Amino acid sequence: MTEFLAWALAVVVVLWLIQILYLRGPDLRAFDGPIGQRRSINAPPSAEHQAVVASLGGIAGALKNVPRRQHLAWLRNYMDNAFPLADAAIRIDPVDVAGVPAEWVLAPNADPRRRLLYIHGGAWTMGSPKSHRRLTAKFSEVAHAAVLAIDYRLMPEHPRLAGIEDCRTAWRWMLDHGPDGVSAASAVFVAGDSAGGNLTLSLIAWVRDQGLRAPDAAVALSPATDASLGSPSLKGNIETDPMLGPLFKALAKIPRAMLLWFGWFQNRMRPSHPVISPVFGDLSGLPPLLVQASEAEMLIDDSRRYVNKASAAGSPVTLQTWPHMVHVWQLFHPELPEGREAFEEIGRFLRESSQGRWAGGPRDGAIS
């Protein structure tokens, strides 16, 4: 009996050490500050934002009537149909990107030689180019660019790395292909939200390491950067995040060690690996990057820690935060004044980051 207890204790100690030293990754508390550039600091949430929050409560209520085994299918269908694109002037062209389904999204002012790869969010399990057309159409407008929105492979049907490979394939392809066929790009960008923001940050590090043409600029909206679940706001902002809070409140009650082991098996990669947790990677030598996040959301500290670490490494990274906002509030930009404000900042950033790469040379004036 004594020998068995000693053996069991040894196993527990080994598992604990693996979890602490291998799965969690380095301590990132040194990068909790500064807090970033705050927008609309003293403004209360708009009436439009309060209406958005109320609508999210309706989603949670509807999901309670759906059998658990059908939750993912229901959420996928909801995302694809919840945000229809009302602007008939937007051009949508389906395209095959070296085996990855995708679509070109072009606003009337888009220059086909200016290209932006957009990587949609959805917790790596849902979402599509269709679900994010409101965002891709607006990115095309403010960037004066053709937007390539990819339908990357999702979990659980595919491993996490499959979606990562699709993003890499799309980047290589976009450098030499536009909406009108084979042609070189005059300017290239990448952007994504939430899980797509995670994939965006993973991609720009990979592009640097491969020596490929770097983006002129990148944008990440409320990105997830730490799959080891180390950010304080994951628990601290549960009650103030009306979108992610209700979905992940139950997970917050599970010990972090158990979630780390589950994540290791689910992703087939340790949670702190830089490919899926960009905050743990080398953040030097990155292109100009704008990160936007809400101070009320669960992922705000993922953004702060990533930006502060990248800035310390010498990369030109900017964090802009808004109070009160829901996760990826930019998706609601037709209704939300805060969403329109965020896109004004994005347009300004992309313009300033790509000066001299407009068709026909530099142009004066702001992007509308």
Which residues does each PLM region occupy?
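N-terminal targeting or regulatory segments adjacent to alpha/beta-hydrolase or S9 domains
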Residues: 1-82, 363-368
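Alpha/beta-hydrolase superfamily serine-hydrolase fold, recognizing
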Residues: 6-28, 89-368
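Non-catalytic accessory segments of hydrolases
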Residues: 61-104, 110
